[in-house]
Every structure is written in structure tokens, then in C-alpha cells.
From Swiss-Prot:
This is Oxaloacetate tautomerase FAHD2A, mitochondrial. It is an enzyme of class 5 (isomerase). Requires a divalent metal cation for activity. GO terms for cellular component: mitochondrion. Coiled coil: none annotated. It catalyses: oxaloacetate = enol-oxaloacetate. Its EC number is 5.3.2.2. GO terms for molecular function: metal ion binding; oxaloacetate tautomerase activity. It is found in: Mitochondrion. SUPFAM superfamilies: FAH.
Length: 314
């Protein structure tokens, strides 16, 4: 991102402090880069629009990727808790580049038509079992990275989603045990090429969902103990400042526990795996007439307690 773009983004984030949704100040794990550091590092975001505590400086034995951090479980989380409680130097936000909180996971699991009110806007029945599809991990980008419109599609749409990040390996997980396998939650933008999703490729959704840059995540992995109730969070999307989606995760048909139990019948979950849990109503394709993203648009996806991600469309 150009310096001018980064300054503009910082201004937007500082203005976000006036928005109705305020992220939690509890444990907010991030992956970031800084000019004086070699490669990605792990950190703690200090608050909405705030700076970053360098966890790798606090404890050089910590891994530098979120997946490795999660694989070590309580041992690394306890270090992060100590860092959160200590009075540590904070890197100014203007000096760091936020990466997706998880990069290159083993899998990105997605759920279709998982909001009651989203089903209503399509005039379709509520599913009786989860509708599962996927994105390739190569679609993941950071919370403030650009979304690139592919030349193959003329119908690129927005979708704000609550994303679950897995923290513990498991298969055939019972719903009652599912939250023990969750590390935390983050904001996702499930960018979707509707022509490829709905008409091309035999109407299989994969290609329409998995173009490069079609899965912005962030800004932080908010640990599950920092989120009061993941199934009662305000969720919204803005395009160029206009609210296009506004809902609540209490409208989800299948909750986090149900999704983990269902999907783990088929595949093994690993630390760092991501589950996109579906989108509320208000997507562009079901508007009359339909509305799609164009170059120059700015999309803001926001979830109460988790934060906001901002992506310029290019």
C-alpha cells in the first residue's frame, strides 16, 4: 500500500472510534510486518485504531506465525496473557502493516445461506443441514489489503461474515465439545463473483468464491474468552460509507458448535483452520436491479467486539 494510502487508512480507522461498534480491548492477536523487522511477527492489537505490542520481542522463543502459535496451545496463550498484562512498548499503527490473522491455513470452510433473514431475501427455505463449500487459502489477504476485480467476472459482490478460527485438532467433534476446539473469532469479507458462482462452472460455487484477494480477514484474532456471545453480535457492511448489510449473528441458522460438529464428520480440523459462517441480508446480487462492486469502491466489514476491515476495490 502506498504511504498516502496508509495515512488515509489510519485516518479512517481513527474515525471508526466514533462508530457504533467498538471492538473489545481484550486479547486481540495479530500478524504484522514492520520496516525494522525481518518477516512477519505476532503481536497484540492494543485497541481500535491502536498500536501493536510485539509478542516476539516480549518472548523471542514464540513462533512468528499464528498457525504455529495456535498449535502450541496454552503454552503460547499464557505468554500472550503475560504480555497483555505488562507495560510494554507499543509500535504505532502507522509503522506496521497488518496481515491476515491467519495465513495459509489447511482449509477455509464456508457456509451458505446460514442466516434466516438472508434466506428470506432470496425467497428460499431455511436449510435443514449446513450448506458447505470452500475457498482456497490463496484467496486470503490482510484486513486493509486491496480486493482485485478479476477480468473474468463482471459481477463481484460483497459479503460480511463472522469467521471462526480453530485452535485445536479434532475430528468427529461433538457439538457440546466444539468450543474447546475454537481459538477465537475474526471478521471476514467473503468476496463473491456471482456469475461464476451462480451460472458458470456447473453452478459449483468454488471458482466464484476463490479468486485471489477474495478473502480479506482481520484485523485480529479475538480469543473466544474475550467475546461475550459470538451468536449475538451486530454485523454490518458498508460500501463507500453506505450501509448495505446490517444484521446480528443471532440470525444464524447453524451456530458455531453445530458447524464444527457437522463438518468434522467429513474432515479433520487443524489449528489455524478458518470457518466463514455465512452472511446476513443485503448483498448486491439480490437488489433490484442488482448492484456489484466497481473499481474505486471501498468496502468496510464490521462486527461488534471484533473490529472493522477496510478493503479498496481495484
Amino acid at each position: 500500500m502506498l504511504v498516502s494510502g496508509r495515512r488515509r487508512l489510519l485516518t479512517v480507522l481513527l474515525q471508526a472510534q466514533k462508530w457504533p461498534f467498538q471492538p473489545s480491548r481484550d486479547m486481540r492477536l495479530v500478524q504484522f510486518r514492520a520496516p525494522h523487522l525481518v518477516g512477519p511477527h505476532l503481536g497484540l492489537e492494543t485497541g481500535n485504531g491502536g498500536g501493536v505490542i510485539n509478542l516476539n520481542a516480549f518472548d523471542p522463543t514464540l513462533p512468528k506465525t499464528m498457525t504455529q502459535f495456535l498449535e502450541q496451545g496454552e503454552a503460547t496463550l499464557s505468554v500472550a496473557r503475560r504480555a497483555l498484562a505488562a507495560q510494554l512498548p507499543v509500535l504505532p499503527r502507522s509503522e506496521v502493516t497488518f496481515l491476515a490473522p491467519v495465513t495459509r491455513p489447511d482449509k477455509v470452510v464456508c457456509v451458505g445461506m446460514n442466516y434466516v433473514d438472508h434466506c428470506k431475501e432470496q425467497n428460499v427455505p431455511v436449510p435443514k443441514e449446513p450448506i458447505i463449500f470452500s475457498k482456497f487459502a490463496s484467496s486470503i489477504v490482510g484486513p486493509y489489503d486491496e480486493v482485485v476485480l478479476p477480468p473474468q467476472s463482471q459481477e463481484v459482490d460483497w459479503e460480511v461474515e463472522l469467521a471462526v478460527v480453530i485452535g485445536k485438532k479434532g475430528k468427529h467433534i461433538k457439538a457440546t465439545d466444539a468450543m474447546a476446539h475454537v481459538a477465537g473469532f475474526t471478521v471476514a469479507h467473503d468476496v463473491s463473483a456471482r456469475d461464476w458462482q451462480m451460472r458458470r462452472n456447473g453452478k459449483q460455487w468454488l471458482l466464484g468464491k476463490t479468486f485471489d484477494t477474495f478473502c480479506p480477514l482481520g484485523p485480529a484474532l479475538v480469543t473466544k474468552d474475550s467475546v461475550a456471545d459470538p451468536h449475538n453480535l451486530k454485523i454490518c457492511c458498508r460500501v463507500n460509507g453506505e450501509v448495505v448489510q446490517s444484521g446480528n449473528t443471532n440470525q444464524m441458522v447453524f451456530k458455531t458448535e453445530d458447524l464444527i460438529a457437522w463438518v468434522s464428520q467429513f474432515v479433520t480440523f487443524y489449528p489455524g483452520d478458518v470457518i466463514l459462517t455465512g452472511t446476513p441480508p443485503g448483498v448486491g446480487v439480490f437488489r433490484k436491479p442488482p448492484v456489484f462492486l466497481k473499481k474505486g469502491d471501498e468496502v468496510q466489514c464490521e462486527i461488534e467486539e471484533l473490529g472493522v476491515i477496510i478493503n479498496k476495490v481495484v
